[in-house]
């Protein structure tokens, strides 16, 4: 019942490096700092209002340093969405790692997803910006979740934990449910506890 559980089979994306991928640990840290600054800047100002100078100012680096790692604003948005997606999937995979069955994984995954979104509200804001800059960026984010999720439901089917059926349809339905629960209860109004939401859906 959750976007969260999609995570397990997802693999870490290799950083694509614009003009130059980081070759040292220091370079990797600088690149990560620029990405984090872009997350804050796009989430606050929006993609079109934000400039490279806003990102570099937030990151505390020179504009020349930005172009060492990224060709421009669209590329850093693409890399940011990719990086954020990996972080979410890795976080949720860890949360459901020791679950005993599909239902428990769904419950823990949904709770973890809602909590993650509550703590990282810029995730949805950046995604919405990406949708109107380059739909492929937006689509890739969800398809990466979906592929891993389908594999997990297929595994649960083989174990007899869920009935055979079209797992791709199930996955997109569950992802949609989690997406809107996140909007309503983790971003817009936090007036229902996440435990209550999970219990309601599991009833």
Question: For each of these PLM feature ranges, what is it?
Answer:
Residues 1-19, 102, 115-119, 147-158, ...:
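C-terminal peripheral helix-coil segments that are non-catalytic and often amphipathic
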Residues 26, 30-38, 55, 76, ...:
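Generic hydrophobic, amphipathic alpha-helix propensity
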Residues 27-30, 167-174, 194-198:
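Short amphipathic alpha-helix in the helical subdomain of ABC transporter nucleotide-binding domains
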Residues 33, 41-75, 79:
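Helix-turn-helix
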Residues 44-48, 99, 120, 159:
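Short coil/turn segments at alpha/beta junctions that flank glycine-rich nucleotide-binding fingerprints
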Residues 70, 129-133:
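Short helix-capping/turn signature of helix-turn-helix
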Residues 79, 90-119, 171-174:
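Hydrophobic alpha-helical connector segments
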Residues 86-89, 134-161, 168-173, 180, ...:
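Amphipathic alpha-helical packing segments from all-alpha helical-bundle domains
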């Amino acid at each position: 019942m959750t976007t969260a559980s999609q995570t397990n089979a997802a693999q870490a994306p290799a950083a694509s490096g614009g003009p130059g991928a980081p070759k040292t640990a220091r370079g990797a840290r600088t690149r990560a700092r620029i990405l984090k600054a872009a997350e804050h800047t796009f989430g606050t100002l929006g993609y079109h209002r934000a400039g490279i100078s806003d990102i570099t100012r937030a990151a505390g680096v020179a504009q020349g340093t930005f172009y060492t790692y990224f060709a421009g604003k669209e590329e850093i948005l693409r890399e940011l969405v990719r990086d954020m997606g990996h972080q979410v999937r890795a976080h949720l995979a860890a949360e459901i790692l020791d679950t005993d069955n599909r239902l428990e994984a769904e419950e823990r995954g949904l709770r973890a997803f809602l909590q993650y979104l509550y703590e990282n509200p810029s995730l949805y804001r950046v995604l919405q910006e990406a949708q109107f800059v380059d739909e492929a960026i937006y689509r890739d984010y969800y398809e990466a979740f979906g592929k891993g999720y389908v594999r997990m439901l297929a595994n649960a089917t083989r174990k007899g934990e869920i009935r055979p059926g079209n797992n791709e349809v199930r996955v997109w339905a569950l992802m949609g449910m989690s997406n809107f629960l996140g909007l309503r209860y983790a971003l817009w109004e936090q007036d229902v506890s996440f435990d209550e939401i999970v219990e309601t859906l599991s009833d």
